[in-house]
């Protein structure tokens, strides 16, 4: 055994200069064009390969293509028919670095552009992909090996980095700036020397060194030494944001030196204008030109210096079908879905955006369109998961086809006001193309509105409550154990909703940590996901393409760990308004801004609130109007303490108060307000201010006479205490008892 160890150490201590010279020799041979192939060329509309061996060429850079071992791991349907010139340059640069055996680091603005470019390159070169979305919860075991218990025995399972190294795949690491700084150094040696020690005792070594040892000692000795060959095709592509412009951890200098970096930028103005004109032929070209000019202005360094968030350029392309279907929308209507600047900018920032809008003659187009309503909703006869919707815009009726479920639901606890009708129609337009985020104050009716939307479209709703300490595993897969003690992965409600075509409601987007939320970006943008147990979720288009190319059934693909995201799946996030500026409560970052289309939901007016509460609770009398008058006085107060008290009197809370007043109409307004606001626990100053507001509105404390003759009586399964009665629950004889 000592001889084996001596031999391993001997070969591992070969002169570094010799190994480096051999490596550079191979790189120079590749650069000098040692490929002996016939002629080939690259076109922006198609790729032409030679008959002897498939080769792809971009300009003067060429790469021989290999048949993938697992074609289901190669990205599909990302390459457009006509590739823009700027994208061709980026692909050429990536091919150069790939040919040199170098790892790549793509920097750029928040959004899916860097990931899209990576998947285009992998599809072009027919490379298999291992994808890891990094977050603050990522650990060393998520990259190397994870220990699982099967049949009472611990086993080490290779994770993405190890699988990619052994199988010659491309490891894509997205979110480099989010991971803890002590995690990525475990990949240092793998990036630099293609070596890595594994927890199960194996050692990964470079292909050249492995082949040399194999030729000298044979496969049996290599297996005994537990040496594993890192494929020469193994590459790493890291995707990240430039820090410190964006929040996150900068790369350590040793790790940074392992990559060749490139800044990925959006297409130039002229090329983008051609794209959006082709996507929205029903919209005036001049209007599209002004919209694009405005969005490019918000991406300049001057705008960044003013504290303005980057405009989500990819969402502009995603949302253009809305404008094309309903050209009566104003430009401001269209822009506010992608860039709700009034939600997250202070007054100075709002003025800067409005001045920019005025520069491009956008704000002069008018305010948001008022007359917007849903005329009819009907099931599609061709597709059970499609819904035909007619929306009235002004005096015209426009037809849309949107995703929907197959359930038949009726909303009995929703009161529609003119404002709700307009907002529902506006949200439905965004639902036709993208996922949505509804932002509004606490208790204003966001959840009720979404439930009504789900009932209208026939969705089954899966609500996911978000919280501050929520991890990436809570969002995707949770680790649990079986009755026998084996470790298994349990799908999260969000993933189940994606597989079953449900409406996933992310309630409390403002609470969850921004780094944890980043793991679902690929699901939002691409409808694809890679889970911790190795399962891969693909969009409907990519899944059906694989079925056709590989001639496999749905069940056979699922047997390979490939599952389809249901085409009707949608996400609606609910959040409270962020604090303006860059404070602690500013949850709306450029990354989150690029994930959804946004809708601002205001609190109901006093008249609207009275209508809703009266119809839902049937509360008569003058108590409720007095209550609402006090509530709106608190909400509109200039005193921050009173406004914070007003949050306890949301529409949701007022509905509870209305139901209580229906059963106990003799209760005074003063008592109801104090109970709802928990006035007994308020600071003395806030309590005195609240009393002054109540007194100003003519509401005073009413002294009640305590009845000392209250009796407690139980008769016929009814409990009576004074004037209050409640039915008792009859305990069944078959219920188990826990006492002797």
Residue ranges and their predicted role:
Residues 103-134, 435-465, 740:
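Walker A/P-loop
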Residues 180-231, 241, 253, 480, ...:
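Conserved catalytic/switch belt of AAA+ P-loop NTPases
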Residues 102, 167-171, 231-237, 434, ...:
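Loop/turn-to-beta-strand initiation segments
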Residues 124-151, 456-483:
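AAA+/P-loop NTPase substrate/partner-engagement loops
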Residues 20-23, 27-84, 91-92, 232-235, ...:
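Alpha-helical lid/collar subdomain of P-loop NTPases
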Residues 95-96, 150-171, 220-228, 482-504, ...:
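Conserved alpha-helical scaffold flanking the Walker A/P-loop in AAA+ ATPase domains
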Residues 127, 189, 232, 248-267, ...:
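A short helix-turn-beta junction within AAA+ P-loop NTPase domains corresponding to the substrate/partner-engaging
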Residues 86, 94-101, 164-166, 427-433, ...:
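Phosphate-binding P-loop
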